[in-house]
Amino acid sequence: MSDNDKTVTITQVRSVIGCTQKQKATIQALGLGRPNYSVVKPDNACTRGQIRVVQHLVKIEEN
């Protein structure tokens, strides 16, 4: 399996109420918006950087 085939499933587990604008914008950029929403994204440096910003709000599953 090459690096291009790897994906991560990102599930929002906490609300963005009380979060900074940067964290709210990152959640929107990931395609999330409400708790228990999930998206599948490619596993690359860009996605990992976005996950790091909101790591306390999301759950990650590597595929």
UniProtKB/Swiss-Prot annotation:
InterPro entries: Ribo_uL30_ferredoxin-like_sf, Ribosomal_uL30_bac-type, Ribosomal_uL30_ferredoxin-like
Domain of life: Bacteria
Matches recorded under Gene3D superfamilies: Ribosomal protein L30, ferredoxin-like fold domain
Gene Ontology CC: cytosolic large ribosomal subunit
GO molecular function: structural constituent of ribosome
Gene Ontology BP annotations: translation
Keywords: Ribonucleoprotein, Ribosomal protein
Family: Belongs to the universal ribosomal protein uL30 family.
Subunit structure, as described in the record: Part of the 50S ribosomal subunit.
NCBIfam families in UniProt: rpmD_bact
Protein name, as recorded: Large ribosomal subunit protein uL30
